[in-house]
Amino acid sequence: MSEGLVRFGVEDGIAVITMDDPEHRNALSLTMRRGLRDALERFNTDPACQVGILTASGSQVFCAGGDLKEMAEHQIGVPERTFVPILNRNLWIDKPIIAAVNGIAFGGGFLLAMMCDLAVAADHARFAMPEAKWSRGAPWSIPLHSMMSQRVWMELALTGDPIDAQRAYEIGFVNRVVTPDVLLSNTMALARRIRDNAPLTVRATRQMIYMAAEMGRTAAWDVADHLFEAVYRSEDALEGPRAFREKRAPQWKGR
């Protein structure tokens, strides 16, 4: 299904959200931002979707960032907190989503890759936070404190210089680097591995990992215990060991 500048499709429980404005390098115009928010909300509320993939059409640009021409035309000063959909900040998603970065991811494109739970990058992809070059800001980059070292983050933010996919992998920003021809298939394979696991455990684990980045160890342990109570009491918690005993694939119900 096509919705403006953002396409949305579902295949075997995996939603693929595709930015599709290559003429404007998938810049985050108002139309693109609205399309992304709508697609992400649809992914979160559709019970048929277990895992999401965020990518872009073409092979050169994932997202070049904010639409600076639009910003200049409308004299955008301080962006509203909801200016760009940011997962776990102004848009709450409880399902895992993977970025399939097919090219340049600058500024807001860097943000989109960062906000996903996992990232797979084509080997020619490049990442940058160029806000310092244009007197903009990157308050959205706060989650990087738990993704990379302070000095790596500092260099990216203060210089605005791009890094290649291999460097992004070395600093822990992306999980895998692959050739462009297998980017989507590799990302789909990763998504299927997650999809096939117990959905309640996947979602609770995802939430636990994010909370651990914000809390002290003891507090995080207590919250994690509470999170997994619902998992342990679920029908799926009985189905897993039963399937293991019967030597068959589990049939998850998500309850």
Placement of each model-derived feature along the sequence:
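Terminal peptide-recognition signature
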Residues: 17, 21, 35-36, 54, ...
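Short, active-site-adjacent cap segments at secondary-structure transitions
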Residues: 59-63, 106, 209
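C-terminal alpha-helix plus adjacent terminal tail
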Residues: 1-12, 47, 160-166, 185, ...
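Crotonase-fold acyl-CoA enzyme core
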Residues: 91-200, 233-234, 238-242, 248
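Hydrophobic alpha-helical segments typical of transmembrane helices
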Residues: 82-87, 140-143, 152, 204, ...
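Glycine- (often His-adjacent) and acidic-residue-rich active-site loop
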Residues: 5, 56-92, 133, 215-216
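Conserved CoA-thioester-binding segment of acyl-CoA-metabolizing enzymes
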Residues: 1-55, 59, 185
